[in-house]
Swiss-Prot record:
It catalyses: AMP + ATP = 2 ADP. Consists of three domains, a large central CORE domain and two small peripheral domains, NMPbind and LID, which undergo movements during catalysis. The LID domain closes over the site of phosphoryl transfer upon ATP binding. Assembling and dissambling the active center during each catalytic cycle provides an effective means to prevent ATP hydrolysis. Catalyzes the reversible transfer of the terminal phosphate group between ATP and AMP. Plays an important role in cellular energy homeostasis and in adenine nucleotide metabolism. This is Adenylate kinase. ATP binds at G10, A11, G12, K13, G14, T15, R127, V137, F138, G200. Keywords: ATP-binding, Cytoplasm, Kinase, Nucleotide biosynthesis, Nucleotide-binding, Transferase.
Length: 220
């Protein structure tokens, strides 16, 4: 299957993408990973992207599209892929359609992970990170430390990142709605959008997504 994954920050896209890709036997293609790989390998596209990023500018659509195209042409993506973070706008969505059409292919589904806005804020704003090791992550509601403000693993101080403040999260949600809702509308007009609730345990959400994708696949 060829799938695009969308959902607000805090919806668990990265986690679900990894599980779904494994269950479906297709590669998980994340734009974040693509940028990091191209920059670390110093590819021409990576150098170009880095030049924009170093100046604090957004990487142009053309560069992102070229990176995605290059990755989707790899042998492991011949029979399908799960895109996470691409397309980010309608221009990129149109480019993806053209890309696939030129190869005689098309998308099978756009999986929309739905989470109420207040839950997104709760999920992200409740995160606490250890100052000694950022891999030690806690949550005031879902995974509280034994002692408030202290890491269970190493005793380091737990803090809230600036990016995780409620004000920042709500701003990120505004950007998401502005950028992504037009993409969802674009794909909905093609009958590709499959919306599921991303509330509940990770395994339940994965199963919900798998069931929805199977139904979508069977209906074609």
């Amino acid at each position: 299957m060829r799938i695009v994954l969308v959902g607000p920050p805090g919806a668990g896209k990265g986690t679900q993408a990894a599980f779904l890709a494994k269950n479906l036997g297709i590669p998980h293609i994340s734009t974040g990973d693509l940028f990091r790989a191209n920059i670390s390998q110093q590819t021409e596209l990576g150098k170009l992207a880095k030049s924009y990023m170093d100046e604090g500018n957004l990487v142009p659509d053309e560069v992102t599209i070229a990176m995605a195209k290059d990755r989707m042409e790899q042998p492991d993506a011949v029979n399908g892929f799960l895109l996470d973070g691409f397309p980010r706008n309608v221009k990129q969505a149109e480019a993806l359609d053209e890309m696939l059409k030129s190869e005689g292919m098309k998308l099978d589904a756009v999986l929309d992970l739905e989470v109420p806005e207040d839950e997104v804020v709760k999920r992200i704003a409740g995160r606490r990170i250890c100052r000694n090791d950022s891999a030690h992550v806690f949550h005031v509601s879902y995974k509280p430390p034994k002692q408030e403000g202290v890491c269970d693993v190493c005793g380091g101080e737990l803090y809230q990142r600036d990016d995780d403040s409620e004000e920042t999260v709500r701003r990120r949600l505004e950007v998401y709605h502005t950028q992504t809702e037009p993409i969802i509308d674009y794909y909905r007009a093609q009958g590709l959008v499959v919306t599921i609730s991303a509330l509940g345990p990770v395994e339940e959400v994965t199963q919900r997504a798998m069931d929805a994708l199977k139904r979508e696949d069977a209906s074609k």
